[in-house]
Regions:
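Aromatic- and glycine-enriched glycan-recognition loops and surfaces
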Residues: 1-4, 8, 60-61
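Active-site-proximal helices and loops of the catalytic beta/alpha 8
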Residues: 2, 63-206
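Short acidic, Gly/Ser-rich segments with clustered Asp/Glu that frequently serve as metal-coordination loops
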Residues: 7-9, 84-85
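Serine-dependent carboxylesterase/thioesterase catalytic core
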Residues: 16, 47, 159-160
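N-terminal small/glycine-rich loop or linker at the start of catalytic domains
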Residues: 33-50
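Active-site mouth loops of central-metabolism enzymes
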Residues: 48-60
Length: 206
């Protein structure tokens, strides 16, 4: 599985291919995202230049990359920051375009498509028309439960909201929960025993 970052780029704009420099290939909303607003989640900057994934030329560039990966033996893709790339009902055919090559695809969706506690289930289901998705909230529940010595109280966050189990991925921790500061570094002060037990339960679900 190859980790593909197609939502944004990092670094000097001068190093971007010349054909991708025109402004129509980029979102210009900027930062200050209202995380309960899906348009802002999919068009706002998360600290890096945000690619206009709804643009057909951008999609073709990514499709060419996917085909190149497949040609060298790659059979699966992890899509970084998938929640920041829209779905067809939002006017973005990116997922329909890039998943047509017979590879396994899953997207990193931290929390949910946005920060609304309800009302975003249809968007999550629409993602799963094309890719599998992560259920990071359930991973957090597993970690917290083992860390506190209590049993988990649910059988899965998104599965209980109607998302098919065969479209969900679980983990004990991720690079985000381990390496970030206290706002996101949920697991970096937990013992390895806690993480191992969380992974054991998560693996039994996958």
């Amino acid at each position: 599985i190859v980790d593909v970052v197609a939502n944004h780029l990092r670094g000097d704009h001068n190093n971007i291919d010349n054909d991708l420099k025109p402004s129509e290939y980029w979102h210009t909303f900027g930062g200050g995202i209202d995380w309960k607003n899906r348009w802002q989640v999919t068009h706002g900057s998360i600290g890096m230049p945000d690619i206009a994934t709804e643009n057909p030329y951008v999609q073709q560039k990514v499709c060419n990359y996917v085909q190149e990966l497949k040609s060298v033996g790659v059979d699966g893709l992890r899509w970084d920051a998938a929640k920041h790339i829209g779905v067809p009902s939002e006017g973005d055919d990116f997922w329909k375009s890039v998943t047509q090559y017979g590879l396994y695809n899953y997207g990193e969706i931290l929390g949910g498509p946005d920060d609304r506690s309800t009302g975003n289930e249809d968007i999550m289901k629409e993602y799963t028309d094309y890719i599998s998705v992560t259920d990071s909230n359930y991973g957090k529940e597993l970690r917290d439960s083992f860390n506190s010595g209590k049993a988990p109280t649910s059988s899965g966050n998104w599965s209980e909201k109607g998302i098919s189990n065969d479209k969900l991925l679980y983990w004990g921790e991720s690079h985000d929960t381990w390496s970030n500061n206290k706002d996101w570094g949920f697991s970096n002060e937990m013992s390895q025993n806690v993480i191992d037990r969380a992974y054991a339960v998560a693996a039994s679900r996958n």
